[in-house]
């Protein structure tokens, strides 16, 4: 029986992992980091995930967090005992913080670039 805090392939759906990878890929792309993380990669069974894949994800989250100045404690995967909710939460929190920072900066850049006061084009 699985420990309570471990995620089985039934609990972590394809949509969950794809959403995480999709956000990560897009945020990396937005800051100019070309990553081999493929959007739409499907992990049907976590018994088949390679530890190297998990380490790639960790490394790219570290790069993203470093860019935005967000603290992220990298985990080194050397065996595949299971992915815990804590691991998924670490990824999601870090990616969401970077996404919020990116959105806020994007809005500020947009406003400062296009906010022409007096010509009827105000944001």
Question: What is each stretch, according to the model?
Answer:
Residues 1-123:
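Extracellular "spike/adhesin" assembly and maturation modules
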């Amino acid at each position: 029986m699985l420990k309570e805090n471990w995620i089985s392939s039934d609990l972590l759906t394809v949509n969950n992992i794809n959403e995480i990878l999709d956000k990560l890929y897009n945020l990396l792309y937005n800051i100019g980091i070309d990553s081999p993380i493929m959007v739409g990669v499907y992990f049907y069974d976590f018994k088949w995930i390679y530890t190297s894949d998990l380490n790639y994800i960790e490394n790219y989250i570290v790069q993203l967090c470093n860019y935005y100045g967000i603290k992220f404690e990298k985990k080194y995967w050397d065996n595949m005992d299971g992915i815990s909710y804590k691991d998924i939460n670490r990824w999601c929190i870090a990616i969401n913080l970077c996404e919020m920072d990116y959105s806020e900066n994007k809005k500020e850049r947009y406003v400062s670039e296009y906010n022409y006061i007096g010509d009827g084009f105000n944001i």
